[in-house]
Amino acid sequence: MVEWLDVFTRTEYKNILIESLEFCQKNKGLEIFAWCIMTNHVHLIFRSIEGQKPELLLGDFKRFTSNAIIQAIRQNYRESRKEWLLEQFEKAGSKSSNVNKFQFWRHDNKPIELWSNKVIDEKINYIHNNPVEEGLVFHPEDYMYSSARDYSGEKGLLDVFVIK
């Protein structure tokens, strides 16, 4: 998220991410191992199972969600920060030569390869504890917008391949 803006405080914007991840799972070969939507960023551990490079899959996801969320912000009559948010996205876009008007996602968040089981476990624990560290919940599995529920034996919002 550019400038670490707190966009995902509204359920409708988080739902756009959830629906987009579901679409990528069903149609683009996205296999999710862990995820978490925070107010100003998203964590995702995934792989591409249909031969598409992870960075291209992530790029498609980011392009679609940036357009969909900006459109949702524009149309949301309850969005008290509408003009300010759009101004921030436009300002960020003006700094980048490959952005037409608005920049929603940061350009420096690229997929990285997780090279060992130890590192994977560390990253999953970090992701799941993010809402606890932010004071949003007391236990990771209590946070709805995360795969921590799946790892605690409950069913979360998305299909997740739990790593044991």
Give a label for each model feature:
Residues 1-164:
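Short catalytic/metal-binding and nucleic-acid-binding patches
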